[in-house]
Amino acid sequence: MIRLVLIYTLLFSTLVSSTGCDKEALAAPETIAEKEYYVSSELIASVPKSMLQSLAKTEGFGAYVNEVKYGVSVYKLQYFTTYQNKEIKASGLVVVPQNMTTPAPVVSAQHGTIFSQRDAPSNFTSLTGFELFAANGYIMLMPDYIGFGASKDIFHPYYDQKHSALAVVDMIKAARKFYKEKNVLANDQLFLVGYSEGGYVTLAAQKEIETNPLHGLKVTASAAGAGGYDLTAMLAGITSGATYTYPAYLAYVLQAYNYTNSWHRPLLEYFQEPYASRMPQLFDGNHSGSAINRQLTTDPEELFAPAFFAALKEANEELTLKQALQANSFQDWVPKSPTRLYHGTSDNIVPYSNSKITYDRFISQGAKYTELIPIKGGTHSNSFVPMLQSLVPWMKAF
């Protein structure tokens, strides 16, 4: 993951010359909303330009060394957001270029699925690579998501549209107060980018911003890769009888919905033994996805409780779950901002067809600035870099 983040950062380095120097700085007066969302910030690292250049070299991206223009300051940001209609504290990582005199564009980057608390961005146990993003003149925001960092006592609301969106949007708003406090100049550009779960979270945040003008935000452009945007279609694939190579995702969704919606169903209603008894320990925040997978099975019929699995196949059973999956799919909204959906055509974790279905729905409902970009032969693990390579020239136009 760290290597992917580094690639993510470096590939955007050429954008700064066209997006960072000629935009109007945000100079709006502080609002009540900003005061309410912002909690605190803590400087956790200061990385000089020379170290970032060395990092680029050691990771095999020597060609980008000259694009490292600034050292960076890395902050942990705490802010208020909402979970189950109650105010909670959340956290994320903010990386800003040092001594930059021109207003910088803001990029909110939504990370892919994580299981371990150690992987929360704001823990910053080592250089992540996103420091290089800021070294090229971007203000980098990366929310931990609810369930990680400051909100680690909550079970992560995985693939829940409302909570995914608010974790991003509230951090963006809280960051405005942070900019003023630290004398950071931000221009009026806001990019949203994410892959896998981050792709889903990106669209959730975009939808929230575009449908709720009270946030006072405007998306410049959005790019989402390989997210499970149509959860009902994902369910159909799971019940088809085919194996699923990453069962940790399936267990994650069911438990997240059970917690987030306060259904309080026993795990034995969802999973067979020995898997049901393993779930609390496997999802305690100390295990990686790979470690969880090794303790589960790739056969959904063996993973799920027989009665539950049979009910999933019936149109009039497990309606509460199915309705929740439908409500958290993107079936009642059309992107207004320029939007790209990227997806590898050989993805066996989140099928390419999921993005195609979502794209076709957007177009049929009147989307004017949405594109579907297939990555031919790409899998879930290797389509991230081609996505970013394609994004560079596209984003230069804004």
At which residue positions do the language-model features occur?
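Gly/Ser-rich "nucleophile elbow"/oxyanion-hole loop immediately N-terminal to the catalytic nucleophile
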Residues: 96-99, 103, 174-193, 214-217
